[in-house]
């Protein structure tokens, strides 16, 4: 992978101890993944109500709580590694995809790429319509077919990402409540019952 110092977008606390520390949010089995995120600078990347590291860990925990397969959960942990349609900056460039795959596995990396590559303005409105099977890639500008399994994983990750932010920030929740309700309603047939119930509980 590229040098984290060259790829990370540090937050206000750029100076830190170089010794990686495991977040209490992660179970011990994921210590290696937590340390890798810190090497990439996720703990210095400012995000809603804290750091990107905190958000990534919490997103993964939601996906696990809802009973998702491990590749989907690991993709949730790394869903912003290449940046997203909602986050400026990235932890690594696309030339590091093989390195990310070595850490979380090829299936999880492919899902993390899919999430980061989504052109939200063009693809989100397609969800719930026949056009949902054609993905729009913001990195390449291309459109291509998406499998049902990949679309379901993408939607589940989307709900987890947005709900984690909504739970962490009252202002975010109030600002985006209506649009998220509409988006999740279109995803209803693609997400788990647990994700649907969590959305209803958080957004009302």
Regions found by a protein language model. Give the residues of each.
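Metal-dependent phosphohydrolase cores
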Residues: 2-204
């Amino acid at each position: 992978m590229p040098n984290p110092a060259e790829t990370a977008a540090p937050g206000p606390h750029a100076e830190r101890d170089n010794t990686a520390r495991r977040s209490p949010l992660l179970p011990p089995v994921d210590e290696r993944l937590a340390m890798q995120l810190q090497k990439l600078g996720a703990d210095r990347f400012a995000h809603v109500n804290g750091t990107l590291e905190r958000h990534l860990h919490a997103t993964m925990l939601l996906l696990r709580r809802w009973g998702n397969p491990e590749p989907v959960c690991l993709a949730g942990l790394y869903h912003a590694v290449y940046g997203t349609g909602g986050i400026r900056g990235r932890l690594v460039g696309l030339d590091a995809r093989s390195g990310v795959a070595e850490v979380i596995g090829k299936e999880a990396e492919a899902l993390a790429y899919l999430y980061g590559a989504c052109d939200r303005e063009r693809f989100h409105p397609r969800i719930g319509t026949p056009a949902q099977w054609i993905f729009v890639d913001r990195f390449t500008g291309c459109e291509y077919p998406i499998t049902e399994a990949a679309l379901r994983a993408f939607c589940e990750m989307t709900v987890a990402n947005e709900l984690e932010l909504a739970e962490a920030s009252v202002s975010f929740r109030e600002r985006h409540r209506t649009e998220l309700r509409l988006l999740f309603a279109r995803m209803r047939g693609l997400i788990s019952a647990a994700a649907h119930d969590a959305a209803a509980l958080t957004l009302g």
